[in-house]
Amino acid sequence: MKTIGEFNAAHGPEAIGLTDLTAVHWNLEAPRLYEEALRRGEAQLARGGALVATTGSHTGRSPKDKVVVRDAGTENEIWWDNNGSITREQFATLLEDFRAHARGKELFAQDLYGGADPAHRVRARVYTELAWHSLFIRNLLIRPERGELAAYVPELTIIDLPSFQADPVRHGCRSKTVIAIDFAQKIVLIGGSAYAGEMKKSVFTYLNYVLPGAGVMPMHCSANAALDETGDSALFFGLSGTGKTTLSNDSSRKLIGDDEHGWSRDGIFNFEGGCYAKTIRLSRNAEPEIYATTERFGTVMENVVIDPLTRVPDFDDATLTENTRCAYPLDFIANASATGRAGHPKNIVMLTCDAFGVMPPIARLTGAEAMYHFLSGYTAKVAGTERGLTAPEATFSTCFGAPFMPRHPSVYGNLLRALMAEHGVDCWLVNTGWTGGGVGTGRRMPIRVTRRLLSAALDGSLAQTEFRRDPYFGFSVPVEVAGVETQVLSPVETWTNKAAFAETATRLVTMFRENFKRFESHVDADVRAAEPVAAPIAA
């Protein structure tokens, strides 16, 4: 077996049972990975320097194909209502078949960290059969110093072989696509999908499993902090496509990270060393920081259509998918934190993409309301972020990230509420979805409105304004905010048909109440009392 690059020879691929490989390319950096990806025909070069790859039929995650080994160690630890399972014997067969499939292949390996806090990070080694996948995960996770590689010993191992086709009968999975996790052996197997996001979310799922036991709250959120001496940090919870990346990229604040973080007794820390931003309809004017990364060498663009002659990207072209993405190192953002860490947050923002158009653009939540809405996780799945999803769909994704939460939501909810109370955190619910009507009749909330409201929330001025009680949801909504049309703050005023608004709001309230029944036995009375009411209450 030929080896290229630096690694700890005492902990090579044989340790995980990968033998008879043609070659392993270890810890290659962007220039070499560009060469390999282009030589193999895996990707194209865009004008500006980004590497552009397509993922075939899988243009989003495949959550229904994700399974966890179910055994004595996980039986009472995993939320099985939300996680698929396979037996230990089925996983053993799958692993052996992965090893057999890899024989004779050239693989790429990256030794990386998940977690900017050394006390709570995981050493993740990722084997891929595609060179561009190796660059993707190198961009997304935290890269060790070169001098650390010779002594690097992996804790978590991910093997990503898109050309592997699972056998549902033999392997106990749902289809030819499989994402299988064995928490005991600390192995993740990804087969049948070239969608690169599966790798980063596998690391996230692993951290979501192990960190609560150490008293650390893992979160599907972005984070930023003030540039001044206060360094006040803020968290932005939200499902993919609701605005976490866009809204945390604010030139007036320091970016901590765009997607995955932990909250420990020492403050918050990024799980990653890069960003994975949606690029569909990306605008140089609206999102200049993200746009600039698409014109840099080292960025990976996924399923972005480029002109065959000029190689200029067309960010408005959704021919391949709505879920077009770019992956780049965090230091491509000028105001990004060099450490990936910050103090305890002063504000938490829960982003919801309201597909019905009846929720206000911003509301202030009490501690009980915050836990209610965190466990509810109301939003819309945005087209393209999951395979087969072509239009926004109202959904409840608990913890604003149900596909990545292996434990019961109450584990994360109780951690969050305790940390919020301990550190006196203000919580805001922000609707980045529709206003003036639902999908098809209304319009998306203007990003300038959202940014203005967030600015007021984060600088403390919004908390000092006058609030009214929302007649359906009960939370506090500002009456007036400088720079924002008063009508927008009251959703009913943006609808032409007031009766249709009342009917739609009541329908959504009913959905909230039905969804929360599964959590009622896991929360206190004040959280149960925070749920919306079926009939409007006095404002």
From Swiss-Prot:
Catalysed reactions, semicolon-separated: oxaloacetate + ATP = phosphoenolpyruvate + ADP + CO2
Gene3D superfamilies: 3.90.228.20, Phosphoenolpyruvate Carboxykinase, domain 1, Phosphoenolpyruvate Carboxykinase, domain 2
Lyase listed as a keyword: yes
Keywords annotated in UniProt: ATP-binding, Cytoplasm, Decarboxylase, Gluconeogenesis, Lyase, Manganese, Metal-binding, Nucleotide-binding
Localization, UniProt: Cytoplasm
Stated name of the protein: Phosphoenolpyruvate carboxykinase (ATP)
Lineage: Bacteria, Pseudomonadati, Pseudomonadota, Alphaproteobacteria, Hyphomicrobiales
NCBIfam families: pckA (TIGR00224), PRK09344.1-2 (NF006820), PRK09344.1-3 (NF006821), PRK09344.1-4 (NF006822)
An annotated GO cellular component: cytosol
SUPFAM superfamilies for the chain: PEP carboxykinase N-terminal domain, PEP carboxykinase-like
Pathways involved: Carbohydrate biosynthesis; gluconeogenesis
Signal peptide coordinates: none
InterPro entries per record: PEP_carboxykinase_ATP (IPR001272), PEP_carboxykinase_C (IPR013035), PEP_carboxykinase_N (IPR008210)
Protein family: Belongs to the phosphoenolpyruvate carboxykinase (ATP) family.
Entry's cofactor comment: Binds 1 Mn(2+) ion per subunit.
